[in-house]
């Protein structure tokens, strides 16, 4: 394989046009569906206001440090995970591709949730779910089969908007980083914040809102003695910040060489957490109204997290409140925007990796990635089994795939040159504030220990009890199978020779290893 190439074949790697553009994209990636439908319920069931203590500890001592790690690797080695880790050690390329395929699996089902949300924007106008939002969501809309069944029968109400979502996001990514992802985030993220602020303000003035806020913020200090609460806090931070599987590493690789990396990470981290708390205020103000209207306590309400919160509980609230259709349009539009900004970041990891390895232009990489992803997405998540399959894949790809990837990433960067001290020196040479030496201890020992505990706990629970009430064959095929496919695909891509003229050498310079 030649290590040289004609100058004409060389292409300049895309970069963010400004630090602000990068920051908006990073925040847009972090702010996703989980901020709105996961955090409020997790906080409420794990100590209420007291949950903010382990949550902030996790943010400061795990979330921000691992965010700095990804920024350091991406910015220093100027590539997506396969190339960046390969530059550190040839054996690291497999880990890089595992990050890429984790992202690939996630986008296939994440797009389906965005499609649901887009449909519900329209349904909100006339409250199409009627008096029984649960039956409408599970039966009329999704046509969901039993937990022990699987069906290939397509659901047009899902497939059509799902196809449109794919066309939209692939079109954006095909324009590259600066002209596509950056410009889209400059529009979508501010719009998301404006819509969600309007939603929260409306919710705060509903009867019973104060009862909901009291339920959300009243601390149960005894919960702090429960290790499960602390693990939930760390899990929420890892998943909501989009760290541990290459997204932020990829985004940082498009920064200019002179960029304030550490300061941007702090802003992105705290912006994400601020939005989560804002989401908690909005969600529980609305839940307080629901409890007030039904004459029950907030603690008696069901469906306080996940898709059920968004597509069953909130439609009930919308039907109860004055001006409900407008509230519904605001809520589901917020879900669409949050989902799209996160989808773009996941897609860029895959597209960027293909561009790095095969010297593809963004539009070609989008097609090579997008066509199979769209077909898989429609075949698995646009059917009557879509909800069940999504639930299984999401559980395993996050709790096993993402966490396992994060464990491997922290250990790899701690053991392979330039090691953590070298990465810290790199960040401090271009950024402020400076990272203290304790960062090496947190990223090299504390964070891998916490992540390993989370991974082992998930593995033991899954091996002993399966997952929820789903049939064993479904859990095996779609749960363990999704992780296995990511591993196999990673091994195959690692063995494929590099064809990018500027990516043929694995030998890092002395300066890179310093």
Pin down the residues of each PLM region:
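Hydrophobic, membrane-embedded alpha-helices of multi-pass small-molecule transporters
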Residues: 17, 24-34, 106, 111, ...
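Membrane-water interface regions at transmembrane-helix termini and the short interhelical loops
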Residues: 42-46, 72, 76, 87-90, ...
